[in-house]
Structure formats: structure tokens, C-alpha cells
Amino acid sequence: MNSSRLPSISIILTGHNQEHCIRDAIRSVFGQDYEGPVEIILSDDGSSDGTFAVMQEMTAQYRGPYRVILNRNETPLGRGPHIRQAVGLASHEWILRQDGDDCSFPWRCRFFAWAVMEYPDAVAVVSQMINVYEEPGVAFEFPAFPSVPREMPAVVLQQGAFSSSAHYGPAMIIRKSAYEWGNAFPITANFEDDLMAFHAWLQGNIYELPDTALCYYRFAAQNISAVSSAFRFADMQTAEAFERKDLVMLEQLKESVEAGMKLCGELLEGLAPVFRSREELLAEMEERRKKISYIDQLQNWWNYSFSQRWSLKGPGKRGIARCLPQKLYLRHLRQN
């Protein structure tokens, strides 16, 4: 097919204080094998380290076919506003995001482009990701890329409420028009992926590649998301610090979920026309209420009595252990 007829893709790679890891991320987007129109936007959100210098250096050395745009904010905007700003710099029809510590497979653009051509009603397509974990004290390297799939992947339409499925920005390609529609509504500084993908869901169908991963998703040893990291339980002081960070993270997640629920309510009152039916919006609100209730439970867990924790405990030994007082629970995790 004529390359000019292939979907046009803007790859947005954002970074903030990621000098130590962003080379791999940039190398992976520079190494795409897609022959359609591509522009790559490297955007630094006011880093205090050499993140932007790495972006400049690698752009100057790049000799590939894609147009590269550099952007730097003097003052950090935060993840959500930064991504929204970078999308505003894009000129192509589809937006493919990547964080500065992740790694795209070379065929990522090509597979997404195939999916959106096969399903022209899609406003977004979501792939799977392969999680990779740092180990404290060990130099990190991404694994070798898997073998290139010989056949195009299976594609399924996501069914049910939006919040019944997981959506991660680095795993999605979204129409720019869906991002632009969402600009009319507030965006949270954290867990922005939920809201941006939700805006896409409101505008049309989301398709999934259920068996196909297209990127490596990196969990840093000190990252709050690295719940299984040995670093997290290196000592009691560190374990307790992570517990406090968890509470901050949960509050940020709750803010994002509540923003989506508020928008559902406003749409039901006629704020703006959307693709989704009244029944779908009501189902989405119910899913978000359940999420908020669960977040409240996690936030208040250590304030519950033993009997309350026991009645709410999860499955297996881990669920039983979590009924212990907090310090005993953390000590148990350190020893296991």
C-alpha cells in the first residue's frame, strides 16, 4: 500500500528527571519499522537533570525517516497537563504515548496501524504490556525483544463498562480527536491515563489486542508501583515509607475515578452528546462507585478493628496476614 495512505501517527514520549533511563525509550521509538507517516515528539517536563540534554543529543544524531520535535517546559506541569500539552503539538491523526522509562517493540506502530485500518470505527486500540522489574543494586537492562509475530494479532471489541477493564496510556493508541474532545474537561495531574482513555471510550469503540504485547513496561525498584520489589521491604523504615506513599497514590487514584464519575453525571444531564447510551453511562458510574468504595477501604484499612479486617480479608495467607497489626504485617512481608 502507498505509505501516504497508511494511518499517520504521532509518537509522544514524555520524560521528567529520567536521564538514567530515557535513552532506551528514545531508541525504541526511533527504531520503529512502520513505513507510514510518523512524527516523534520528545517532551521534557522541566527536569532538573540531563533528560532534555539526552533528547537533544539523540535527536541530533538521528538519521531515520521520521520527523522529530523537541519540547521542554521550564517549569514542570505535572503528568496529565504535560501530556495534554504534548498532544497539542501533534499534527497526525493517531496518538501513541510512551513514558520515558518504557520500551516499544519495533513493530508497535505497524501493528496498531493495521488494527485501526481493519476497524475504522475504533477511537482507540489497546495492547498488552510485558512488565519488567528492576532489582536493587543490579544494573537494569531490558530483555531482548520477542520474536516478531508471523501473523497479525487477534482483535476484540471491549465490552461492558469502561472501568471494568484496565487501560494504560503506554498500551494505547488513541485518535487525536478523542484527546481534543477531552480538552474541554479537567485533567488530573496523576492517573491521567484513566481519564484520557475514558474520554476516548465516550467517543466511540475501543478495541483490544488480548494476546499481543507491544511494549515493555518498566517497574523501577523505588517506584511506588513496584509492590513486589525487594527494595520496598529492605527495612521497616523503608516499608513504612512505602505504606505512606501508597496512601498518597490511592488519594490520587480516587481523584481520577471521581472526576470520571462526575463527568458521567454531567453527561447524563445533557452536558454534551456522546457515543455511549444512558444505560452505559449509568453502568460506568456504578463501576466507579465500586472502585471508590474499594479505595476507601484500602485507605482506612489500618484504622479498622481486627474483626473488621478479618471480615474484609482477601484470599490466601496474604489476606490472613493483612489482618495483623500493621507493623507485624510489614515484618511478615519482610521475612517472606
Where does each model-flagged region fall?
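Cell-envelope/extracellular polymer assembly enzymes that use nucleotide-activated donors
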Residues: 7-10, 28, 39, 195
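Short, well-formed alpha-helical segments that are part of the catalytic scaffolds
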Residues: 18-31
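Acidic helix N-cap motif at the loop->helix transition within catalytic regions
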Residues: 23, 49-58, 103, 107
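A conserved acidic beta->alpha catalytic loop
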Residues: 44-53, 75, 99
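Glycine-rich, basic loop-to-helix element that forms the pyrophosphate-binding segment
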Residues: 73-90
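Short aromatic/hydrophobic "clamp" motif used to bind/position activated sugar donors
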Residues: 95
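Conserved donor NDP-sugar-binding/catalytic core segment of glycosyltransferases
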Residues: 107-141
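Conserved nucleotide-sugar donor-binding catalytic segment
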Residues: 150-237
